[in-house]
Amino acid sequence: FFSKSKFISILFFVSFILSKQSYSNEFDKISACAGVVMGDGAAELRDLQNESNFDNAFELAIKAFYGEGLSNPRSKEDITIAESILASNVDKIYMQPEWTAEVYEEVIRCYRILGLKVLEKSDLIKNNIDMINQYLNKYKARLKRIINAG
């Protein structure tokens, strides 16, 4: 026999577990798209020496990443996985030997997703803009240096 309070406790526990998983899934999705957009910007800098497009892509990706990342409590493991997903997708796009229609569609889809995420999290981003800009400038400079050295 399940008492009413046990049932409610189990329901609450299951809801908590599922909601935490959905937070992680959304963060993973945004991390993946941030990597795709950063990879696109990096390829623009490498192939076309278009620093403005690189800067814009990087800024959009970082703001969406931190906007989503700061919106819920995250474990160190969640953050580590999200950063790995981001880095993997930067490499995936940056190292593309040729752009197929599928790659192009993925890049466009990710720009849209990140644009919407920045709009959705705009207040959170504004409230944390100093911290976000520190990371933005630090990592943008590092990636530019790596691209220009290669």
Region roles according to the model:
Residues I8, F12, S19, R46-Q49, ...:
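Compositionally biased amphipathic helical and low-complexity segments enriched in hydrophobic
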Residues K6, F12, I30-S31, M38, ...:
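Hydrophobic alpha-helical segments
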Residues F1-N25:
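Classical Sec-dependent N-terminal signal peptides that target proteins to the secretory pathway
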Residues S22-I30, E98-E102:
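Structural motif
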Residues A61-G150:
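Compact alpha-helical subdomains of small soluble proteins
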Residues N25-T80:
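Short N-proximal segments of mature Sec-exported proteins
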